[in-house]
């Protein structure tokens, strides 16, 4: 989940603030949408997924891993915090350990409560 379409109106004129009208909404507001997308994609396919959308902390990354992402990426947070990758990695390790996981990837698909589904196979 990179962005979803959004619209912001000028409070005074009630005209769109962007010349094109709509733009991309990103950041923390996307996290629940990204989690739902990863959860559904994992359940449907079992294929490797890179979770993207609203990750600002290690706890957020661990949520995506638990939902079925085998990796996650940072986006909007980098504008405000260029050091976020280092911080998030450290937080991720602490969050996993605090929840009893030996490593962050040990939490992989924990939200699904069972073994990974069989990935879809290509039909010739």
Describe every region a protein language model picked out.
Residues 37, 69-72, 76, 119-122:
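Contiguous, function-dense segments enriched for cysteine-driven chemistry
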Residues 31, 47-59:
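Glycine-rich beta-to-alpha transition loops that act as phosphate-gripper elements at the mouths
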Residues 1-7, 54-55, 59-88:
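Glycine-rich phosphate-binding active-site loops on the catalytic face of alpha/beta enzymes
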Residues 9-23, 65, 77-102:
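C-terminal helical cap(s) of enzyme catalytic domains, especially alpha/beta-barrels
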Residues 1-47:
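Glycine/Thr-rich beta-alpha phosphate-binding loop at enzyme active sites
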Residues 45-49, 69-70:
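Short, well-ordered coil/turn segments that N-cap beta-strands
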Residues 31, 86, 90-124:
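Extended, intrinsically disordered, low-complexity segments
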Residues 22, 49-52, 73:
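Short glycine/serine/threonine-biased micro-segments
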């Amino acid at each position: 989940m990179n962005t979803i379409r959004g619209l912001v109106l000028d409070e005074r004129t009630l005209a769109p603030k962007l010349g094109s009208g709509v733009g991309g909404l990103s950041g923390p507001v996307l996290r629940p949408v990204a989690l739902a997308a990863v959860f559904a994609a994992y359940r449907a396919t079992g294929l490797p997924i890179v979770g993207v959308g609203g990750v600002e902390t290690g706890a957020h990354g661990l949520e995506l891993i638990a939902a079925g992402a085998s990796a996650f990426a940072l986006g909007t947070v980098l504008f405000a915090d260029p050091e976020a990758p280092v911080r998030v990695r450290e937080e991720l390790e602490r969050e996993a350990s605090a929840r009893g996981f030996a490593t962050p990837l040990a939490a992989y698909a924990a939200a699904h409560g069972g073994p990974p589904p069989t990935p879809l196979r290509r039909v010739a």
